Structures are given as C-alpha cells and as structure tokens.
Amino acid sequence: MVMTDPIADLLTRVRNANAVKHEVVEVPSSNVKKAITNILLQEGYIKNIEEYNDGVVPMLRISLKYGANNERVITGIKRISKPGLRVYCKKDEVPKVLNGLGVAVISTSKGLVVDREARKDGLGGEVLCYVW
C-alpha cells in the first residue's frame, strides 16, 4: 500500500507508542523524518535515534523519553500541514505552541527549524507539526 503522508505516519507511530509507554518505535527512514526526529532529540522530547538497514528499507529506531515517575515527555503531537491542505506562515505569523511551552516544526528555505529559530532568523515556511 502506498503511504500518502509519511510525516503523519511518523507522528502517529510516535504518538501511539508514547500512549502505551513503549521504549522504542521503529519507522521507515527518509531525510525529512530524520530531520524531524533530530529536532525532537535537540528539544529533549526523545532519548535517542538510531538508523539501521534491515535489508529492504532503511529504518529509524526512536527511543522515547519518559520522566522520573514514568510520565510522558511528549504530551501531544499534531500534524498541521497535510497533503490535502497545506499550511504556510509568513515570518511575522510564526505560531507559538502553548505560549512557548511546545514547539512548531517549520520547513523553511534553510531546512527544518523550530518556531523559535524561525522567528529569530526572520523565516516563514510550511508548518509541519506541533509538539508539546
């Protein structure tokens, strides 16, 4: 079956694994997925990313992060711009997620960045997802 939205698939797998408190989740790898997971790693939402090849498709193994009392670090994760309805923002309209408690991942001309960096660098682009 052809996947129409691989980014939504990544976010859904992470959301579902996080909901049942799995330690790791595996997703097929792509450059955009690697960039999104690297942002999640830098922002402290996940523990580790490992890329491996199972012979057919390169995969990403994402280690999820939990707090001291096993509480979830990722409270919510939401796809914003979808293949059927793209969502863009200008440099002056970069969204804030929960007044700065979460991050928006934005695809800009400089690559994927979080909302803070887009505001600082004066960049707009496609709003891929919110994580909080």
UniProtKB/Swiss-Prot annotation:
<dbReference type="GO" id="GO:0003735">
    <property type="term" value="F:structural constituent of ribosome"/>
</dbReference>
<keyword id="KW-0687">Ribonucleoprotein</keyword>
<keyword id="KW-0689">Ribosomal protein</keyword>
<dbReference type="InterPro" id="IPR035987">
    <property type="entry name" value="Ribosomal_uS8_sf"/>
</dbReference>
<comment type="function">
    <text>One of the primary rRNA binding proteins, it binds directly to 16S rRNA central domain where it helps coordinate assembly of the platform of the 30S subunit.</text>
</comment>
<dbReference type="GO" id="GO:0019843">
    <property type="term" value="F:rRNA binding"/>
</dbReference>
<dbReference type="InterPro" id="IPR047863">
    <property type="entry name" value="Ribosomal_uS8_CS"/>
</dbReference>
<comment type="similarity">
    <text>Belongs to the universal ribosomal protein uS8 family.</text>
</comment>
<protein>
    <recommendedName>
        <fullName>Small ribosomal subunit protein uS8</fullName>
    </recommendedName>
</protein>
<keyword id="KW-0699">rRNA-binding</keyword>
<keyword id="KW-0694">RNA-binding</keyword>
<comment type="subunit">
    <text>Part of the 30S ribosomal subunit. Contacts proteins S5 and S12.</text>
</comment>
<dbReference type="Pfam" id="PF00410">
    <property type="entry name" value="Ribosomal_S8"/>
</dbReference>
<dbReference type="GO" id="GO:0006412">
    <property type="term" value="P:translation"/>
</dbReference>
<dbReference type="GO" id="GO:1990904">
    <property type="term" value="C:ribonucleoprotein complex"/>
</dbReference>
<dbReference type="InterPro" id="IPR000630">
    <property type="entry name" value="Ribosomal_uS8"/>
</dbReference>
<dbReference type="GO" id="GO:0005840">
    <property type="term" value="C:ribosome"/>
</dbReference>
